[in-house]
């Protein structure tokens, strides 16, 4: 595979925030860039390129033939921003050698509307890490 989600020897992944002006079609989002990235109006809680995610690794289920990757929740503290989308992307590892662009996209999260935080904490809480709910699931 092009992305290595192993918690011990896998690639490094980040989560960046974007405004509702970002075009998020599969052909438009191939990797991280600063176009329409959420700006930090005040405070120091969000910087360009976002947060590094803690990768909890890959788990599988032999009964359902579904594997899933999981990340720990991540927070931006003392942040003032408005975001609609989050991009999970591979920030280091095998992307270039696997033929992918540097900072290649894994997935886009849509918050369903603008989410505004003013001098507060914005937490991205990942769903239950299981075969029905995990953000990244692969069946075989």
Where are these regions (language model features)?
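Small cysteine-rich, disulfide-bonded extracellular modules of the LU/uPAR three-finger superfamily
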Residues: 1-84, 91-140
């Amino acid at each position: 595979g092009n992305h290595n989600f192993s918690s011990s020897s896998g690639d490094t992944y980040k989560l960046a925030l974007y405004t509702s002006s970002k075009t998020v079609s599969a052909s438009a989002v191939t990797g991280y860039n600063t176009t329409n990235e959420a700006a930090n109006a005040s405070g120091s809680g969000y910087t360009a390129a976002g947060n590094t995610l803690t990768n909890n690794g890959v788990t599988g289920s032999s009964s359902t033939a579904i594997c899933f990757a999981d990340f720990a929740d991540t927070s931006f503290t003392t942040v003032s921003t408005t975001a609609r989308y989050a991009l999970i992307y591979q920030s280091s590892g095998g992307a270039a050698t696997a033929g992918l662009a540097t900072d290649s996209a894994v997935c886009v999260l849509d918050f369903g509307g603008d989410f505004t935080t003013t001098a507060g904490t914005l937490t991205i809480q990942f769903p239950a890490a299981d075969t029905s709910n995990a953000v990244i699931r692969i069946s075989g």
